[in-house]
Each structure stands twice: as structure tokens, then as C-alpha cells.
Amino acid sequence: MAASPLGVWSEVGKLHQVMVCAPGLAHERLTPSNCAELLFDDVLWVDEAKKHHAEFVAELRSYDVEVLEMHKLLEETLDTPGGRDFILDYKLLDRNVGAGIGGELRHWFNEMPTARLAELLIGGLPFAEIPKGLGHGTIDAMREVYGPSAFALRPLPNTQYARDNSAWIYGGVSLNPMRMPARHQETLLTRAIYNYHPRFAQADFKFWYGNTDEEPGLAALEGGDIMPIGKGIVLVGMGERTTWQGVSQLAMRLFEEGAATKVIIAAMAKERASMHLDTVLTFLDADKVTAYPKVVDTIRPIVLHPSTSTAPFDVELPTESFLEVVAKALGIGAFEVIETGGDTYAAAREQWDDANNVVAIEPGVVVAYDRNKHTNAKLRAAGVEVVEIGSAELGRGRGGGHCMTCPIVREAVDY
């Protein structure tokens, strides 16, 4: 059980517990021919990525943050009554692996060590690695025709960015339907962990959204767009990865449960460089943020309030800027905004390299990539303590420290 009640009550309060997912087998499956489909800009030097991720985890632990690793949580979940069946029942559906092979794969999976099964569920399983003779000839045919390039289970390298497939919002969690096909099956694994792992199965928290077998339709939500900032306010980016269908349902559920006082939507352009709100804006302290103005200044705010009619919520379209609307909601005069550093060219490069995607360990202390020298210097000049980590490989899927952490226990801050 967690030492503190589960829940995330701010973006910058003292961080007590996070989930991460270290680079591993899934990244070893990346090739020049499949990396774009799997949402990576290039293949990784995996050993270097592992080293820098381990350094990241060590830095978090040095500040007394409990770091939970997804591979280990998944392994322990597979050993619980119901956990293994829950995952395999879905993963081995005909629509996921093709007709006629799920039963034999299940038997094979149940004979292998649990740690190996957990590794394959994240790392992927090529047809070429399945024992010959399984699958009534189907697997042998796929192996013969496609060789190592065809997967029975697709690798999930974007689990490295643990922020996205679930999001803790105050006293509960949203299990997020992901926008891109390469990430669709991530949420199944976190759903299993939160429902079956002993750490969570007996804990006191609510599922705000997604703990159902209902197909999401056009609804998409990703955790990099979701920020519970305090006073019951939730920011939600709505751009490349999060849709109105997802935002509106999440807001409705939060209001129905009395879990939010307002949801402030950041309507953004649908661009990869700013795929989530946290790629252009993160919090440094209660009244201090880092932002990429070229995008943040164009955000259109939409504010949803608990309903005063038969509608699921009331809708407000403010005329102020997004940051002005957020500051007003928190009851502060204005944010101190530290913009992406360097000239026009350097700022564009550093934003692309996640300069504005920092994660707060506590108020005024953040983890940032070492490559973003101009922005980090500006943060330090503004009184922010910047803990730098290696970045050459970790950012190839477009995510920094904020993306690589799923906070589970974080304190509130005073406003």
C-alpha cells in the first residue's frame, strides 16, 4: 500500500510517488522502417537511453520520491488472481492477434516465467520468436512471408512516456483512450495494474473515466494534456492527441462526482511539435510556469463549469488569454512566465527537445534535459533549481521529464 492516500492535487506540490517505464525490449524492436509508425523520430541507442533513464530515476529517489517501474508492476499484476486473465483475455482476442492463434499463444504464455511475459507485453512479440508449429500453420506462414518485421503483439515503446495512458486527477484516475494506433493497447496494462495489483486494488480512489469495456469511439485523452493544478481546477489541452469527445466526457464525470470546480480547455493547433499541452507549458512553482510563447500565445481557452441546467456542463468562452484565465481561476494576479531560451532558432530547437516539458519534484525544483542550455539558464536566473539529466536518446519519441512520469501521489499547494 502507498504511504500516502493516492491522488494528485497540484502540478508542483511535493511529489511522493510516480510510475515510470524504463526503455527496454520495445526500444530494441525499433528499426528505421518501423520507428515512424511507432511514433519515434529515430531509432535509439538503447543502452544509453537506459543509462540516462536510470539516472533520472536516481535523481527522483534522491528527493525521496517513490518510483514504481511499470515492468515490475505488470509482472506483479500478472501473478495476482484475475490479473493475468484480464490482460490475456483482451490481448489475445481475434481482432488483436488474428483468428485461430489466441488459445495456443495463451497456453505458451502461461508456461513462461512471469517476468518474461511482462517484458513481451510491453516489448512486443514477433511471429519469428514464436515456437514453430503453434497456430495451426498461421504463425509459420506469417514468419515465412514477413520474417522479423511482423508482430503478433506490437511493441509499446511509448510506455516510456508514462504520463499519457493514465492521469491521476485529485482523488482518482482517468484511464485514457489513446489517439494513435501505436498506443491503443498501453491503457489495458495500466488498467490491469490499477484494478489488480495489491498496491492499488485495495486502495481508496476512484476511476473517473475509462474503467470500462466500452469502445471509446472518437474520444481520445492523453495525460500530457491533463493537469490538475489545484482548487479543483483541471487544465486539459485539446490538440493533436486529445479530442473534444474525450475532454467533454472527462469533464462531465468529474463534475458528476464533485471532483472538479472547473475544467479549462486549451484549444491548440494539431501539430506534432506541440502534441500535448505539456510540450509547450509546464509549472515550475505555484505562480511560475515555463512556456513556448509561439504556441501558448495562440491557445484559445474554453472554460467548462458544473451545470446549472439540464446540460452536462456550462460553457464559457473567455476573451482573455489562456494564462490570464488560468491565473484568474487560481486567484493570483499573473504568472511569472519563463519563456523558452535562446534566439528564434534556438528556442524552436529547445522546444522540440522538450525544454518546456519539465517535471516539478517540489515547488521551485524541476528535472530538465541537459541539452536545453538556454532555457535551463533562464529557469535558474528566475530562482528555479534545475536538476539536469542526460537527453541524447530519451527524447526521440518527443517527451521530457514531465512526459516520462505518471504522478500518483502529489501534495497540494496553497493559493
Swiss-Prot record:
Active-site residue list: C403
Listed GO MF terms: arginine deiminase activity
Documented EC number(s): 3.5.3.6
Record GO cellular component, one term: cytoplasm
GO biological process terms on file: arginine catabolic process to ornithine; arginine deiminase pathway
Keywords: Arginine metabolism, Cytoplasm, Hydrolase
Protein name: Arginine deiminase
Origin species: Corynebacterium aurimucosum (strain ATCC 700975 / DSM 44827 / CIP 107346 / CN-1)
Gene: arcA
